[in-house]
Amino acid sequence: MTTRSKKTATAASRTPEAESALKELFIDELKDIYWAEQHLVKALPKMIKGATAEELKQTISDHLEQTKNHVTRLESAFESIGEKAKPVKCLAMEGLLKEADELLSETDKGTEVRDVAIISAGQKVEHYEIASYGTLKTLATTLGYSEAADLFAATLEEEKTADSLLTKVAENYVNEAAVAE
């Protein structure tokens, strides 16, 4: 069995058509997450208002500020590749946010169970964002968009941290408090 190095295989198989198609996919994904982040800026205040535990409220409030920065970073990423920042509806995020609204309406206000539901919804969103930014970072690197790749890498780390913080809030307090209600 013969193997070629990654670099050799990439150089030998890269065609202008394939690169153009990959760039189009990359831009579509970028527009998708741009829409998602803009809508998260609108949705996170509802989660903050619905939360009971102060630690959860603070965690989401901090992430709201980060999310606003993510929108700005995405605008910088668009600019760095010579594209206009244009959101395109993200069906996945739309579904996740709809589910979050349903969880809020199906749980009693002021309960730890609602906090568990908020953490669950928040982590689903974080996992979607982690997947999206990981993909964008890899595609940006492949396409030679190093500035955009660096922006996505920074956001990816923040999304991983947000997910970890939600886990800590759940494990350190909220889940046990919900069982005791």
What kind of feature is each model-predicted range?
Residues 1-181:
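Amphipathic alpha-helical hairpins
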